[in-house]
Amino acid sequence: MPRRRVVGQRKILPDPKFHSELLAKFINVIMQDGKKSTAEKIIYKALDVVAEKKSEAHLSILEAALDNVRPSVEVKSRRVGGSTYQVPCEVRPVRRNALAMRWLVEAARKRGEKSMALRLAGEMLDASENKGTAVKKREDVHRMAEANKAFAHYRW
């Protein structure tokens, strides 16, 4: 592998309906087996359901949901001497978004509604109101980091 230069991150094309890069990224997180059009249908239907229930703009609710799910710290395993410590570390902005989207989708998949669009809509509504499984996941990660604050000096 050549060591000459660092390859920059690729620009993602905005989604066709709302022209949002964030939404395009979210579509890619939802997508399974390369079925992008199915993922787009799920997201757009979920956004319509959300806009119906709350009289706000589609993307503002998604933004609010992701803001409430984004973690600021996480723990990473670090082996020191013969024991492994859970060391709290700050999360980079790109990873924050990625984790928030992943947790939102995972929480939606575990819900009980009939279609994935309804599950996703429900989870987005819950997350925008600071409740739901995805927000609980973020709280757990923050609690874990708080509990292991004593090992923060092992940070790298």
UniProtKB/Swiss-Prot annotation:
List, in alphabetical order, the Gene Ontology terms for molecular function in this entry.
Answer: rRNA binding; structural constituent of ribosome; tRNA binding
Q: Which keywords has UniProt assigned to this entry?
A: Ribonucleoprotein, Ribosomal protein, RNA-binding, rRNA-binding, tRNA-binding
Name the chain's protein: Small ribosomal subunit protein uS7
**SUPFAM superfamilies linked:** Ribosomal protein S7 (SSF47973)
Q: Name one GO biological process term.
A: translation
Q: What gene is this protein translated from? A: rpsG
Subunit relationships? Part of the 30S ribosomal subunit. Contacts proteins S9 and S11.
Q: Which GO terms describe its cellular component?
A: small ribosomal subunit
Give the family per the record.
Belongs to the universal ribosomal protein uS7 family.
- Decide whether keyword RNA-binding is in the record: yes
Question: What is this protein for, i.e. what is its function?
Answer: One of the primary rRNA binding proteins, it binds directly to 16S rRNA where it nucleates assembly of the head domain of the 30S subunit. Is located at the subunit interface close to the decoding center, probably blocks exit of the E-site tRNA.
This protein's species is Shewanella denitrificans (strain OS217 / ATCC BAA-1090 / DSM 15013)
RNA-binding among the record's keywords?
yes
